[in-house]
């Protein structure tokens, strides 16, 4: 007997009170429990008259789509027709994309510094919440976001994957243990990698909780005397990849190397680079190359050896310094997440300041998800990516009904993650408000 699908099924677009975003209830409850909207309302001031949406409503209307993975402002239209989402998040009639763009363009110079100030207060709060440490590790990096159009600041610059293409060149700082983004700044596409890093470091110090030690890691783009002097001035430790200038290269061959294993050996020396005020400790990791390894590396080589060089003030052994630096791989993963899973570094408007505000809000969206994950989800969910969290918890279908005149959100009874949902809801209920 031949089996066929139904030939008589009818389709009717009449169902109401449905949503793709049933799981956003958890994020809404998380922010509600913290009294996040109250914090925005009390901390961010803007002179306006008779606007349909409050400042906090428009800021959240920008942040929520970022959390859900909607890639640009235009896609917020999807939420404008979703009454259940609007009810769950307390956003009556979601603002239109043009409304949000005008909000960014018209108010960015006023809102950006205030938003950063609020974000920094939140960063300090969540660094100390549920986590105890005697040391923070700050990782600095930059990324490139290729863009098309004529937006302010989108110019040709360092863009190794798309050479000759225009881009922004944002700067980022994260904490090495937790992954929190402690700073981010949109920059012109032709900005030097180290441009603004000293100022960002100084700003982070103003809200970083006191600890016994502070360590900084950065790649060769941040091999900058001003940055390193500022680190020294603040009694912090650092490991920064050195530029292999000719004087440095000339020193590598004549050193006495200590063998670590069959392929690696280390050495060190003190050296004052040209134009620097002081001499610093330089540590070298020499690696014996196979033919396969030669193809993988883009490092300075001499006689079948590759040389990795760090400038540091750490008291660790040379190999210990490299072990510490190599733990920085987590930063590269975070950069990819910000670039690929959030709209960090994109250009929703032609205005640089408006796009910088949008970038700051995307970092806030990233941190909100991270804080929610750390405080409200089980230990075995701590390593999950934002894409997995969206798929398993946030983007689950729901039906909104009323029972005994009380609102009820119905989620699928066969959900694989019902226990996780209830676990998170219980954890949220136990949280204290921000109390700023």
Model-predicted regions and their roles:
Residues 1-165, 169-209, 234, 396-436:
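Dynamic "connector" segments at or just before major functional cores
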Residues 2-9, 13, 237-340, 398, ...:
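An anionic, glycine-rich sequence signature occurring as long contiguous blocks
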Residues 30, 76, 144, 318-361, ...:
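Short amphipathic alpha-helical "interface-anchor" segments enriched in bulky aromatics
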Residues 42-50, 318-325, 341-357, 373-384, ...:
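Short, solvent-exposed helix-loop connector elements
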Residues 77, 93-94, 214, 376-386:
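Short, glycine/acidic-rich hinge or "gate" loops at secondary-structure transitions
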Residues 79, 141, 184, 217-219, ...:
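Generic beta-strand/beta-sheet core signal
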Residues 213-223:
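Acidic/histidine-rich, metal-coordinating catalytic segments
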Residues 225-229:
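Catalytic cores of alpha/beta
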């Amino acid at each position: 007997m031949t089996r066929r699908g139904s030939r008589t099924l009818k389709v009717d677009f009449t169902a109401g009170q449905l949503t793709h975003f049933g799981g956003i209830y958890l994020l809404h409850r998380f922010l509600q429990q913290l009294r996040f909207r109250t914090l925005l309302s009390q901390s961010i001031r803007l002179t306006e008259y008779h606007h349909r949406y409050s400042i906090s409503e428009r800021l959240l209307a920008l942040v929520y789509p970022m959390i859900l993975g909607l890639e640009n402002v235009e896609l917020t239209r999807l939420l404008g027709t979703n009454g259940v989402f609007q009810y769950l998040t307390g956003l009556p009639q979601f603002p239109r994309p043009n409304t949000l763009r005008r909000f960014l363009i018209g108010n960015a110079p006023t809102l950006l510094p205030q938003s950063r100030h609020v974000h920094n207060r939140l960063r300090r709060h969540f660094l100390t919440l549920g986590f105890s440490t005697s040391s923070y590790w700050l990782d600095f990096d930059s990324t490139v976001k290729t863009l098309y159009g004529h937006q302010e600041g989108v110019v040709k610059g360092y863009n190794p994957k798309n050479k000759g293409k225009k881009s922004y060149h944002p700067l980022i700082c994260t904490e090495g243990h937790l992954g929190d983004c402690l700073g981010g700044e949109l920059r012109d596409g032709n900005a030097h990698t180290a441009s603004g890093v000293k100022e960002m470091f100084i700003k982070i110090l103003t809200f970083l909780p006191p600890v016994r030690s502070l360590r900084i890691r950065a790649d060769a783009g941040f091999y900058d005397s001003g940055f390193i002097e500022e680190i020294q001035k603040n009694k912090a430790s650092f490991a920064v990849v050195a530029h292999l200038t000719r004087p440095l290269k000339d020193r590598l061959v004549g050193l006495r190397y200590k063998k670590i294993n069959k392929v690696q050996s280390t050495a060190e020396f003190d050296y004052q680079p040209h134009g620097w005020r002081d001499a610093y400790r330089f540590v070298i990791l020499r690696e014996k190359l196979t033919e396969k390894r030669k193809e993988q590396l883009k490092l300075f080589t001499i006689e079948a050896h590759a040389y990795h060089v760090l400038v540091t003030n750490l008291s660790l052994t040379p190999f210990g310094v490299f072990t510490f630096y190599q733990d920085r791989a987590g930063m590269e993963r975070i950069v990819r997440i910000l670039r690929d899973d959030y709209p960090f570094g994109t250009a929703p408007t032609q205005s640089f300041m408006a796009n910088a505000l949008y970038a700051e809000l995307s970092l806030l969206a990233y941190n909100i998800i991270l804080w929610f994950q750390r405080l409200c989800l089980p230990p075995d969910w701590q390593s999950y990516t934002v894409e997995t969290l969206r798929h398993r918890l946030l983007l689950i279908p729901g039906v909104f009904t009323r029972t005994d005149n009380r609102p009820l959100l119905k989620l699928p009874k066969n959900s694989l993650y019902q226990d996780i949902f209830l676990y998170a809801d219980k954890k949220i209920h136990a949280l204290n408000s921000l109390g700023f």
